[in-house]
């Protein structure tokens, strides 16, 4: 009898202990404060270098991705820096060897490129900008716009230095901070350090490109064909240097802009310039070099990932922020778990890398759209019900992560479109050069682009917009090249190139 009671007592003790333990464990999970930030590939992506506060130092990690300590005489970026107005100085440049930047600060203002061109009397600034844009796209002469021709002549020394700089081999652009921001101030009052970086050289090249193209089109209009090509080749070389390494998406956008503008100008020179075979072959070599750029996926997986995770760490794990009410006492159960948004960020960034790595345009766009649709659905989804014994900080963290990523994660489709448009522009220019070389050799256009292989093209190029061979047809003795949808006979588009009419001694401009 006593033995049976002892056994029952032991059994009930075990059952009650198990129930109490399970309830206690779940109650602790419910009321426990969120864990600290975990340094791991799943959350912070990098585990070193670490800053003194123990958090990943994304800024130092970014600096290791770019070449540094390139001598000024070999650094094409230093040539651009010399021409930028002195509102930016080397004092706020982040560079391992800023000596050449300091020396560039001593260049007299008279030798720098004055931007924008001052409007003549009676002309509004908007009209000046419109005229400059037009003159950068089509041939013109000094008599057409004397004020613009004088301005280009006044800045000829600066433009010559810009063109000479593109022939340097190295590329080490400075990264600058606002004058009131120190590189040791990782968590600023408004923006994290990486998002505060400015790109003065790349930004200047974007604005300088129209000026260089305006001079190129003037040279073409006045018969200086080689001078016109020299300026266009300058932009191709700068774009090539920027895009050779997987930089930020902003830098990549600048490179694609330079490529698209230079490719359009190249087609103008080819069709208006009556070139010889040697110069056409030189154009093709430059165009081929430009097309060989670093994959977009590498940019997303390096600079964009570092920058975004730096921002998320600043938002959710900044140790310098004042302690919030949610971090005090019992309210800690409502505090945010920084690991949740960082893990979500890495998951979506990895999906963006996979999308950019897809082999066809349709697959890339479809994968990119799926990411955007999921982010939008999560952002607008109603808050889910908390499960029994689910920690409150999980609910709070999940809700904040959904809203934040939907607003801040960079869109991929715009970069994909920029890449495809620039690629198509370069391919069309290359094919136009090959067609002109074929015409010089045979006196007539080929029946198909396959006839250009292998003498003038290594293979028939694919259209980046359709993943099929680039469009080509002959009608009434005149050839047409296009990228994308088949154009109408009178369609005007940057991705449509028309050759000379069969009975025309002159070669018409690209529409």
Predicted segments with their positions:
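Short acidic linear motifs
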Residues: 2-511
């Amino acid at each position: 009898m006593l033995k049976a009671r002892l056994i029952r007592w032991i059994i009930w003790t075990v059952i009650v202990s198990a129930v109490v333990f399970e309830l206690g464990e779940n109650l602790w999970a419910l009321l426990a404060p969120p864990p600290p930030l975990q340094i791991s590939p799943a959350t912070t992506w990098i585990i070193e270098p670490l800053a003194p506060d123990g958090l990943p130092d994304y800024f130092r990690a970014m600096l290791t991705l770019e070449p540094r300590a390139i001598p000024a005489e070999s650094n094409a970026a230093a040539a651009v820096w010399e021409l930028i107005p002195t509102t930016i100085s080397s004092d706020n440049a982040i560079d391992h060897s800023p000596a050449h930047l300091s020396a560039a600060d001593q260049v007299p203002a008279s030798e720098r490129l004055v931007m924008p061109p001052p409007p003549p009397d009676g002309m509004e600034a908007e009209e000046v900008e419109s005229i400059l844009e037009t003159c950068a796209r089509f041939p013109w002469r000094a008599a057409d716009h004397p004020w613009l021709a004088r301005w280009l002549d006044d800045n000829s020394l600066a433009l010559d230095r810009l063109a000479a700089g593109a022939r340097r081999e190295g590329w080490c652009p400075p990264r600058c901070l606002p004058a009131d921001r120190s590189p040791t101030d990782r968590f600023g009052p408004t923006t994290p350090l990486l998002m505060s970086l400015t790109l003065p050289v790349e930004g200047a090249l974007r604005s300088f490109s129209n000026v260089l193209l305006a001079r190129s089109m003037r040279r073409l209009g006045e018969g200086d064909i080689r001078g016109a090509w020299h300026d266009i080749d300058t932009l191709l070389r700068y774009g090539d240097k920027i895009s050779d390494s997987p930089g930020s998406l902003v830098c990549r956008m600048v490179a694609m802009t330079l490529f698209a503008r230079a490719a359009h100008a190249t087609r103008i020179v080819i069709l208006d310039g009556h070139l010889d075979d040697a110069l056409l072959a030189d154009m093709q070599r430059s165009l081929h070099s430009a097309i060989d750029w670093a994959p977009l996926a590498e940019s997303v997986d390096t600079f964009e990932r570092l920058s975004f995770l730096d921002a998320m760490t600043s938002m959710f794990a900044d140790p310098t922020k004042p302690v919030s009410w949610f971090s005090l006492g019992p309210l800690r159960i409502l505090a945010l778990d920084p690991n949740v948004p960082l893990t979500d960020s890495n998951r979506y960034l990895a999906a963006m890398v996979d999308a950019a790595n897809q082999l066809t345009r349709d697959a890339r766009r479809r994968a990119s759209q799926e990411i955007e649709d999921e982010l939008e659905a999560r952002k607008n989804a109603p808050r889910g019900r908390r499960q029994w014994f689910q920690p409150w900080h999980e609910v709070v963290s999940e809700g904040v992560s959904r809203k934040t990523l939907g607003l801040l994660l960079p869109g991929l489709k715009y970069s994909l479109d920029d890449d495809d448009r620039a690629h198509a522009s370069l391919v069309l220019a290359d094919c136009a050069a090959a067609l002109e070389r074929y015409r010089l050799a045979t006196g007539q256009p080929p029946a198909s682009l396959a006839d250009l292989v292998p003498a003038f093209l290594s293979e028939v190029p694919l259209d980046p917009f359709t993943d099929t061979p680039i469009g080509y047809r002959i009608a009434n003795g005149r050839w047409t090249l296009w990228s994308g949808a088949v154009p109408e006979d009178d369609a005007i588009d940057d991705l449509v190139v028309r050759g000379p009419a069969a009975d025309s001694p002159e070669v018409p401009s690209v529409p």
